């Protein structure tokens, strides 16, 4: 059984520039989340364009390949660049997930994240395209210190940059057991450690329950001027 749920909140900001969408096709479940950059609503347009384009990747119910996903990211980037003729500041991070019967594929640009849990334990996660992640790679800080790192929000890659390409793609076979995926913007993960996400997952039996706990934790711990925070949760129970 698969359950999926999403939420998006403007947090302490005047405008919500996050976008999250999902669709359950006949053979594929596709989820996409974008965190727009640019301010004044321009980022919202960018994240909407990216999500509208990428949600179609998998709609034909065929196996989504790395090459197909790259082409879809390219198409989204071209659309954003075209729109920049009017709104030249607009860019967006993106994280994409497609789950089928026995496999999953995901890709991302920027610092919106995907977490994969297997049988209740964190199994994998994306690495931010950011200055803070470079500091982790150089052993200057550990992963839990990213939210407090100076210049944490500075990212190297985002859709809306000329010649930008999909940087990170991962494909896995879904082994028997329980799987859970979380796609989220930085407004979520900067307040939730890997351990806390795992703890909240253990308290939930469906995606909606898990997401409710995540949102509650964010809203109870965020400052007044907190960033937009959005997430999509997918839970697969007892795949055999």
Language-model features: where?
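PP2C/PPM-type serine/threonine phosphatase catalytic domain
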Residues: 1-240
């Amino acid at each position: 059984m698969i359950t999926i749920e999403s939420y998006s909140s403007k947090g302490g900001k005047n405008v919500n520039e996050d976008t999250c969408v999902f669709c359950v096709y006949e053979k594929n479940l596709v989820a996409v989340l974008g965190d727009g950059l640019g301010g004044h609503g321009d980022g919202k347009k960018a994240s909407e364009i990216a999500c509208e384009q990428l949600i179609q990747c998998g709609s034909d119910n065929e196996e989504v390949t790395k090459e197909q996903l790259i082409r879809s990211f390219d198409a989204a980037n071209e659309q954003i660049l075209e729109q920049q003729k009017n709104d030249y500041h607009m860019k967006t991070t993106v994280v994409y997930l497609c789950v089928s019967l026995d496999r999953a594929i995901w890709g991302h640009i920027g610092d919106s994240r995907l977490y994969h849990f297997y049988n209740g334990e964190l199994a994998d996660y994306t690495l931010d395209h950011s200055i803070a992640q470079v500091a982790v790679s150089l052993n200057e800080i550990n992963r839990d210190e990213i939210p407090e790192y100076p210049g944490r929000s500075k990212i190297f890659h985002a859709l809306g940059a000329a010649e930008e390409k999909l940087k990170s793609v991962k494909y896995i076979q879904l082994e028997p057991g329980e799987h859970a995926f979380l796609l989220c913007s930085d407004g979520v993960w900067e307040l939730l450690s890997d351990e806390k996400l795992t703890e909240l997952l253990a308290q939930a039996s469906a995606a909606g329950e898990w997401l409710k706990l995540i949102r509650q934790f964010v809203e109870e711990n965020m400052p007044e001027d907190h960033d937009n925070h959005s997430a999509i949760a997918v839970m697969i129970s007892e795949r055999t």
